[in-house]
Amino acid sequence: MSASVFIERRKIRPLRTEAACIPTHALCFNVLGIPYMDPGNGGIRPLNPDDSDATACVHGVAYLLTSDDLKKVILSEGGGIAYQVARLNAKLLLDDSPIVVDTLIGRHNVDASNERLPSARYIGVLTRGANELNLPLSYQRRLAEQPIYQPKSGWWFQLGVALFLWPWTRAAIITERLVYKHQGPDGHVPAWFLFIFDCLLWLMWAQHDYIHGPIFGRGDGR
C-alpha cells in the first residue's frame, strides 16, 4: 500500500491510482511468513455478515496496471507461492463508485484462530501507506491498534532467534531467486515448485511450534 514500496522499490508505474475498499472482506494476517522476523503477512478474508463496523472492511489502493506490471506484482509477492489472484467487487472512496479489482489473497486458507501477528516493520508499511492515501482516520486508527509481534529481550531468546534465522533466511533468499528463474508467462511458478515450497514452509513452522518455540520462546506473538 505504501508508494515507496510499490512504485519506487518494485519499479511499477500505475496508469491510475485510487483509494478504495472491498466491502465484503476484512484485512487479516493469515499468510505465514518467517517466525521471529515477519511471522504474519497480510491477506484478506470474508467479513462476518454481522459486522456492522464501517472500518472493518479492508481499505487500500486500487492501481490500474499494464499486464507487464501485474506480472511484476505477482513476482514481487512470490510468484504465487504465498498468494493467488482473486477478482472481487470494490468501490472507490472518492465517490463510492463500484469497480472490479484483481487482488491477492492467501493461497492457504489459514483459520483466524491460527493467524500469526505481523511485525512492527510490516504494520509500519501499512500505516505509512494509509497515511499517504489519506484513508479514513478510523481505518488508520484500526491499523495503529493492530497487535504486533514484539521480540523478547534476553540473551537466551536472542540466541534462539539467531539459530533459527540463520538457515531459514538463507532459504528465503534462495527461494526468491528460484521464483524468478522458474516463473511462467504470467509470473507464477509451476505446481512442483509450490509443492516443494509448501513442504519447506510447514517444516519451518513445525520446527518453530514444536522445537524452537518451547525451548527459546515463540516468534509469532502467540
UniProtKB/Swiss-Prot annotation:
Induction: Expression is positively regulated by the thioclapurine cluster-specific transcription factor tcpZ.
Listed pathway(s): Secondary metabolite biosynthesis
Membrane topology value: Multi-pass membrane protein
Compartment(s): Membrane
Transmembrane segments: 154-174, 187-207
Record carries keyword Lipid metabolism: no
Record carries keyword DNA repair: no
EC number(s) given by UniProt: 4.3.2.9
Disulfide bridge positions per record: none
Protein name: Gamma-glutamyl cyclotransferase gliK
Protein encoded by which gene: tcpK
